[in-house]
Regions:
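Eukaryotic phosphoinositide-binding membrane-targeting regions
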Residues: 1-181
Length: 181
């Protein structure tokens, strides 16, 4: 199988302007990080998506975000986007899309590079829940990742590569996923 064609070429995440990675992310891994195992049904993600597609939860959590990445070997990982710091020993707060501050404290989110410990990725992006009224699909994926994709069109997965990832999710979760730019 040609992984370059299926998911894109491997690339490292971009570094900050000073040549380093974000210090608050180095050495951190999201607690919700999960590997999609071919042939096994991921009930956690399935339950989450089905719950979030109900009107009351969809409206309340529309901005919640799941991030995903495909590593060099073609393995798919995902996590809920989490804050860097723990609020207590049992809970890592899940971040909301574009959330920058809580009560004046800057939110430091764990991004795509933390899913692979800053190693190479083939494709990265976000998973968004489809609105309850959309009966054709349960979730969408895109190829948005600031450090793996932003600023260089050659780093962004193609629609075909994104659909290949969507197909992996569909197979593992038992729901309908669709690629969306």
């Amino acid at each position: 199988m040609d992984l370059d064609a299926k998911f894109g070429v491997c690339r490292f995440p971009k570094k900050e302007s000073d040549g380093t990675y974000r210090r608050y992310e180095v050495g951190k891994t999201p607690k919700s990080k999960t590997a999609i195992v071919t042939g096994e049904l991921d009930q956690t993600l399935k339950s989450y998506i089905l719950a979030m597609r109900t009107p009351i939860l969809y409206d309340a959590f529309i901005r919640s975000l799941v991030i995903w990445t495909v590593d060099a070997s073609g393995q798919l990982f995902y996590s809920f986007e989490e804050f860097s710091e723990e609020f207590d020993s049992k809970l890592t707060c899940v971040a909301s899309l574009n959330l920058k501050y809580i009560s004046g404290i800057k939110c430091l989110k764990l991004g795509h590079p933390t899913l692979l410990n800053f190693e190479e990725a083939r494709a990265t992006g976000e998973l968004a829940i489809a609105p309850p009224e959309d009966k054709s699909v349960d979730a969408y994926i895109n190829g948005r990742s600031g450090r793996y994709c932003r600023g260089d069109k050659t780093r962004v997965p193609t629609v075909r590569q994104l659909q290949n990832v969507a197909d992996l999710f569909s197979s593992a979760v038992g729901l309908r996923f669709k690629a969306r730019l």
